[in-house]
Amino acid sequence: MAIAKKCVRFLLNFNYRHPVTTGTLRRYSAGAGDTSQFDVAVIGGGIVGSASARELILKHPHLKVALVEKENRFAFHQSGNNSGVIHAGIYYKPGSLKAKLCVKGLNLSYKYFDQKGIKYSKCGKLIVATERSEVPRLFDLYERGLKNGVKDIQLMDSKEMKEIEPHCKGLQALWSPHTGIVSWAQVTDSYVKDFIECGGKTYLNFEVKKFIEAESAEYPVKIIDTENNVINAKYVLTCCGLHSDKVAVLTGCPEEPKIIPFRGEYLYLVPNKSKLTKTNIYPVPDPRFPFLGVHLTPRIDGRVIVGPNAILAFCKEGYRWGDYNMQELKEIIGFSGFRKMAMKYASFGIKEMIRSAITPLQVMQVRKYIQEITSADVERGPAGVRAQAMAKDGTLIEDFVFDSKPGHGAIGSRVLHCRNAPSPGATSSLAIAEMVVEKIEKEFKI
């Protein structure tokens, strides 16, 4: 504990400057000095922002809507760096937004993919109990799935499980036949294409620096980027993922829930071992910890990924160990909720960091259900950063969070925030979009 305290003090007092990343596009694509005016500006071009902008203009084609993204392409962060799983809705607390919107979103997603010709595979998922102590929890998941309205799930013994996955071992399993895989980055691009075709306007390389109250009574919100380009809007929807807390502060709204970035690192199975699985294979989640555990996931490109782990990222966009931002790290460590969470999950966090450095330890996690996989059968793969919302008491906020703060000034009263939309946010995106547009209609009288 004394060593941990010394490390925290060192990080808080360390002033090393983060090296500047070169080659990142920052120019505003519509040209300097543009003062476009919109009924609604959607900030954040991930899958939730893109789906919401699309739904808004589909439902209200008379509105002028902008979709604003700070990077040089859409789905740059969480939406383009994930496992690609189409979730069925088994894990989530009955009655929660996640449970309702995931089940609805899955059905909407498959219909949309078919309409647009987007490649996907309904390859299913096995949640496998490999120890006796996991079997009761597996039954609980089954009951939860039924309560959530997940279709066609069934409990299987080891013989039935092997009929689906011959190489998989376990005592019992929960089979979800409608779980699938897709490229969520491709889906996001399709949403954006729909939005543009309906008359929406997109802005890339527009990194929001501040919101100020404009003199115009008709367009009272002025959105300014890091190069002083301007967009004027009547109302704003923010879907900023990893930066949702910071963007909320810019509008005069509270920072909480605080976003803590967790990196999830994946391994690839080498191509000649990809045949070992054709479906998603997940462990029974341990209720003591907030993550689902290391699993096997086939990807739409034919490769199979193993992972992810879950380790603290040293900045909002910390995809590698060498990525860090001292100011952001100080803010993370200085947040009381993080310190409480870190104490609670210290053992788990240390083990995850060790597994990140020592690949065979991560492989051991999947050997519980496929013994043929060895350390020689994997190679380093992609990584993603999850935006985890956290309360002051250290509680991880698991459900989706959408809010507006009508009491927080002229700008805050005109903004709706998507504060927390982690997994299954992609699966739920079309359902989230419908709900968000209903909120916009109700709160902003559009």
Feature roles, as predicted:
Residues 51, 211-326:
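Flavin-dependent oxidoreductases
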Residues 84-164, 170, 293-294, 315:
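Dinucleotide-binding Rossmann-like beta1-alpha1 core, especially the glycine-rich loop
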Residues 75-105, 115-120, 160, 313-351:
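Glycine-rich active-site loop/strand segments that organize a redox cofactor
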